[in-house]
C-alpha cells in the first residue's frame, strides 16, 4: 500500500525571481519497485536564512506529487480449517481456529469480530450521517438537530441470509436507515464475507430513498461507525497526515504512513466539536503493542479514531467534560462535508457538501500482530 522513501535534494544558488520559473533536473537514479507500493515525490520549500519570524530551514510549504509508477502483485488467500456456522437466541456465529464473527439476526448487525476469545471489533458497522456540530455549522444546527434529527438514527432489519462455500461464509444483511420521523433515508445492503484464513471483507451499498419532499440541504457525512477493543490505543494509518484534514482543509497534509495514540489523534479545541478526521485513508491499524486490528480499504475513505462518541462531544462545553467511551470509536466515511467558514463567512462550496445520495464502500478487517501491518496491508488478493 504505502511506503515513505525519503530523498533529500538541496539546491544552493538556484534563484527564481517572483512570477518566473526554472527547470531543475532531479538526480534520481533508477530503483527497483516494490510490489503494491505507492511512490510520491515530496517537494519542500524551506526558509534559507534566519529571520525574526522563523529560523533557517523552517518549512514554509510542502507539495506532494504522486508518481505514476506501480508494480501490482496478487496472491491467493491461504485456507485454514473449515468455518463452522451456528445460530441460536438471535445470534449467528461463524468461526474456526483463526476467526470468530458474531451477527445479530434481530438487530441486523455485526456484534463482534476477533479470534482466540479476544474481541478486536466490539460492534459495527452501522450507518451514520451525524457529526458533532462544529462552529461553522452554527446556522445549520437547528435544522439538523431539531427538524431532521440527524443525531437520532434508526436502522431497521429487513433480512439476514447466510451462504456457506468451500473456504468462506457470506452473511448478507439488509436494513433501512433513517432518522426520527423522516421521509428520507437509505436502503442498505451489508455483505460480510468471512474467510477461513481469518479475514472478513465488508461491502456496504446504500441507495438513497425520498418518500416526501423535505430533506436536509446537505448532510454532515455519509459513513459508518464501528467500535474497537478499548485496549487498542496505538494507531497507525496510511493516508493524509500528520494532522487532521478535511476535504476543504488539507493543504498542510500529505499522504504517508503515520503513527499516534488514539488520544493523540484528537485536535483539542477549546470548545468540543468534530475533530481529528483524516482524508484519503487506504488502511489503518489499532493495537495494544502486541495484537492489533488491520482494516484495508478498497477505495480511500475518511477516518476518525477516538475514545469518545460524537454525542459526548456535542454534550460537553469544555474539554474536561468529554465523557470517555468504553470502546475505541471508529468512523469510516464515504464522504464528510467540508468545514467552510460559516461562523463568520461563507458556507462550504457546493462540491464540498454531502447531499442525499447513493453510496458504496468496502474494506477488509483482520487480526494482525503489531509490526506486521505494513507487510499485510500491501497484500492484494485475486478475488
What are these regions (language model features)?
Residues 15, 27-36, 49-51, 65-383:
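Beta-strand/loop-rich accessory regions of lumenal/periplasmic or secreted enzymes
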Residues 2-58:
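Intrinsically disordered, low-complexity Pro/Gly/Ser/Thr-rich segments with frequent PxxP/GP/PP motifs
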Amino acid at each position: 500500500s504505502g511506503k515513505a522513501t525519503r530523498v533529500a535534494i538541496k539546491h544552493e544558488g538556484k534563484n527564481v525571481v517572483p512570477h518566473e520559473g526554472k527547470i531543475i533536473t532531479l538526480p534520481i537514479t533508477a530503483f527497483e519497485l516494490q510490489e503494491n507500493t505507492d511512490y510520491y515525490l515530496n517537494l519542500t520549500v524551506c526558509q534559507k536564512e534566519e529571520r525574526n519570524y522563523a529560523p533557517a530551514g523552517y518549512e514554509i510549504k510542502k507539495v506532494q506529487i504522486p508518481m505514476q509508477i506501480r508494480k501490482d502483485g496478487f496472491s491467493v488467500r491461504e485456507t485454514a480449517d473449515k468455518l463452522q456456522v451456528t445460530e441460536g437466541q438471535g445470534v449467528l456465529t461463524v468461526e474456526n481456529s483463526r476467526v470468530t464473527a458474531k451477527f445479530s439476526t434481530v438487530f441486523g448487525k455485526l456484534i463482534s469480530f476477533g479470534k482466540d476469545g479476544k474481541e478486536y471489533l466490539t460492534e459495527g458497522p452501522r450507518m451514520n450521517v451525524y457529526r458533532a456540530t462544529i462552529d461553522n455549522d452554527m446556522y445549520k444546527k437547528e435544522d439538523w438537530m431539531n427538524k431532521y434529527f440527524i443525531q437520532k438514527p434508526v436502522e431497521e432489519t429487513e433480512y439476514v441470509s447466510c451462504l456457506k462455500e468451500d473456504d468462506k461464509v457470506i452473511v448478507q444483511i439488509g436494513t433501512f436507515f433513517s432518522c426520527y420521523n423522516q421521509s428520507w433515508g437509505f436502503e442498505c445492503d451489508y455483505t460480510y464475507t468471512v474467510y477461513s484464513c481469518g479475514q472478513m471483507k465488508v461491502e456496504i451499498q446504500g441507495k438513497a430513498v425520498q418518500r416526501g419532499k423535505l430533506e436536509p440541504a446537505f448532510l454532515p457525512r455519509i459513513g459508518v461507525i464501528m467500535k474497537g477493543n478499548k485496549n487498542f490505543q496505538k494507531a497507525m494509518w496510511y493516508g493524509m497526515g500528520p494532522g487532521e484534514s478535511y476535504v476543504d482543509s488539507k493543504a498542510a497534509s500529505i499522504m504517508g504512513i503515520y503513527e499516534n495514540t488514539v488520544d493523540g489523534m484528537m485536535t483539542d479545541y477549546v470548545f468540543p466539536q468534530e475533530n481529528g478526521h483524516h482524508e484519503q485513508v487506504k488502511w489503518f491499524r489499532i493495537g495494544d503493542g502486541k495484537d492489533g486490528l488491520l482494516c484495508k480499504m478498497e477505495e480511500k475513505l475518511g477516518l476518525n479514531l477516538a475514545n469518545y462518541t460524537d454525542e459526548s462531544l456535542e454534550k460537553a462545553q469544555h474539554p474536561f467534560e468529554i465523557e470517555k467511551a468504553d470502546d475505541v470509536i471508529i468512523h469510516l466515511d464515504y464522504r464528510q462535508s467540508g468545514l467552510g467558514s460559516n461562523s463568520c463567512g461563507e458556507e462550504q462550496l457546493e462540491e464540498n457538501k454531502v447531499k442525499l445520495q447513493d453510496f458504496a464502500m468496502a474494506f477488509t478487517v483482520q487480526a494482525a500482530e503489531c509490526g506486521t501491518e505494513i507487510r499485510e496491508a500491501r497484500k492484494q488478493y485475486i478475488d
